[in-house]
């Protein structure tokens, strides 16, 4: 009888423990919230990383490259205030900068020239502000003066980049001497793309057309055609204590207008603001 009592106590204790475990598990594995996870909304507009740090990094890159090319260490780079990229080469450099030599220097082919440009971009990418695989050559021309020009567009995002940024121009002589270099590419674009990919447009294509037509007071004869979503880069509003606070990236609808006072409108796809017209 005593043994039976002990067995019943053990069974009761086991049952109590099992019940406690089941209740605890139910408390941990709550049903999913039908409204989705409760988290803070992503920051918007998406700002470029601290431009001050970027300017310091670019200044160091210029110093290192200028030493490699025999340029005086006292020469300072002309850096873009918003992107920290090389806006122009300093005037009156004490030494020349050349494209890398590819093929026969006396008779370079167009393929040789493009390969030399590619190698130059790889070497100067910290000042250019773009990864080589983000850049597409959109124009290669020769001016009447003999100066050769190569123009590139930066295409780092899922959507096209607008706002006048993401451009690289290299000017050089037939012997490969660089006479001009200008970039306003977006540095660290991969980090920005990660943030942009989390955005879901809050304005539909049809709503964008309606908003543009109403806000621009377009005539009935005007034709409004939404083209595509784009990433629009524009200077952020700087605090009074600073000359600039870098760039902001916005997801926007690019809308073409025919027979109207403007030809193109950029409507923020998140905030429903008109951010630019052309």
Regions found by a protein language model. Give the residues of each.
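Segments that shape or occlude catalytic/ligand-binding pockets
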Residues: 28-278
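C-terminal motif of bacterial Sec signal peptides marking the signal peptidase cleavage site
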Residues: 22-25
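Bacterial N-terminal signal peptides that target proteins for export
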Residues: 2-15
